[in-house]
Amino acid sequence: MFFRPGLCGRRNFLQTLAGTLAFPWLNRLVWAADPQDRPPTYPFLEIPAAASGITWTHTAGSSAEKYLPESTGAGCAFLDYDNDGWMDIYLVNSGPCDFFAPARPLRNALYRNNRDGTFTDVTERAGVSGGGYGMGAAAGDYNGDGFPDLYVTQYGRSILYRNNGDGTFTDVTEKAGVAAPGWASSAVWFDYDNDGRLDLFVCRFVDFDKSKHHHCGAPNLPALAGLNEYCYPKIYSPMPSWLFHNNGDGTFTDVSQKMGITDNPGKSWGVVATDINNDGWLDLFVANDTVANFLFVNRQGRRFEEIGFTSGVGFGEGGKARSGMGVDSADFNQDGWMDLFVTNLNHEFYGFYLNRHDETFDDIAGPSGIANATKLMSGWGLKFFDYDNDGNIDLLIANGRPDDLIEKIYDNVTYREPLLLFHNSGAGLTNISRESGPVFSRAMSGRGLALGDFNNDGAVDVLISNNDAAPLLLKNIAGKGNHWVGLSLTGKTCNRDAVGARITWQSGDLKRSTMKTGGGSYLSSHDPRIVLGIGERGKMDWIEVKWPRPSTVVQRFTDLPMDRYISLVEGEGKWK
């Protein structure tokens, strides 16, 4: 993640493109360049703090010592903590730890949605201010009471906040047994054993504390004389992540060793729960920094098999480990199989993996245009989503170099970097960032990225958390130009959040499918609702939901309203 760019092996673009002839299903993914295929300009509008009321700012505690955690946080989340149907916002901050003593009190922030485009800080009343050097957040209803709970990852000790259902939370970390000591990063709620309860996977980064801090620099470079740089994570030892099984009584059991997680120590950042082989058991794709990425395939709830190497997602070209940070999963080419994406450091290119239906993947970053667009970028949070509701899956990425001294060395790599927006015309991805308005020209220290429709207009909005800076709230304008139906799924036999559900929908000549994944991005958590875009078509013919195991229910819903959210409950035949 923190190495200085140099001469790296690069995929020969023309050779890669020619290789698509062997895979006809790649042809329609090739970089689209027709300006007529591009969506309207200015798809997102920045909502300034003066308008939103979100005045909180992230403080990294940056020091001349260059302690590694300073450059990596933090995350953000959309969640409806009070169950009023409107997405609230949670932001994670740094705090006191063995290497950082803040000059003033620092805290995380929970902002309640006022339903008018503004937010009110309710952190103190809710009791979710944190208490350490925060990293990320994951929202999920682990006890099935209908209110989202909140897991906050930290350097040192993480926190589980149980939602009391009255606007307040209780720290139940010790009782639940999920403190996950060490340096935790991303986390995800998902039901790995299909017992109907959400379990918890927590990524762990390197073996680090103040006593293990190294002074790293480049004494041979005059521009860095006497200065420390953030160390390359390669010098730190990898650590195994955690898997906690939900016992159904408010407690969890650490099953990391039993399930094969501890067999694979890593330097893990992002995680997404998905189903890469369509067997109905949720798998995990984990981004690792300077060691191979993990693809933990769930062998029917009995054990996870790590197949990153054999699947083709563990390494970059030439068999080299890259600096994986953010991840996501979606059925990009609509063949019924979930694809994968990972962001990396500059000069490594981001990884875009198309599922070959046999537990192997092809990296199509070259022919899709991703490699060319990301050569000089360092990516963190990202999400696949249909931002303009035309029925095609687009891609948004937050970027920013982790080393704030990089500009003293290189002319073409910057510390702060702009967002990247790729529009899917149905024929491929087009990088439309430069023509998408001022916000996409702004350099920022992007880290977390969360999706959520905060104004309930069906156009999914975006929250970006920036390192040592204010967050960025983006209102989606483009999505309002097309028709949509939003789904709120409630499981009964399956997990209440319905993580793992498969949704298929038909509108005239348009047929699409998606999956409700768990997690994704970097240190962040998202609106649990799903928005189905259908473009200019005026009617949704039907929506089919295949509920996750242990449910065996498959339901088809018709006579659907347009341009509004509806509630679908497992086993109940009518939408609400």
What are these regions (language model features)?
Residues 1-9, 19-22, 33-34:
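N-terminal secretory signal peptides
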Residues 7, 27-54:
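C-terminal segment of N-terminal export signals and the immediately downstream linker at the start
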Residues 9-18, 119, 169, 252, ...:
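N-terminal export leaders
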Residues 40, 50-51, 61-62, 369-372, ...:
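Gly/Ser/Thr/Pro-enriched helix-cap/hinge segments flanking short amphipathic alpha-helices
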Residues 43-57, 61-64, 68, 120-132, ...:
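Short loop/turn motifs that recur once per blade in beta-propeller domains
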Residues 89-93, 149-154, 200-204, 284-288, ...:
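Hydrophobic beta-strand segments that make up the repeating blades of beta-propeller
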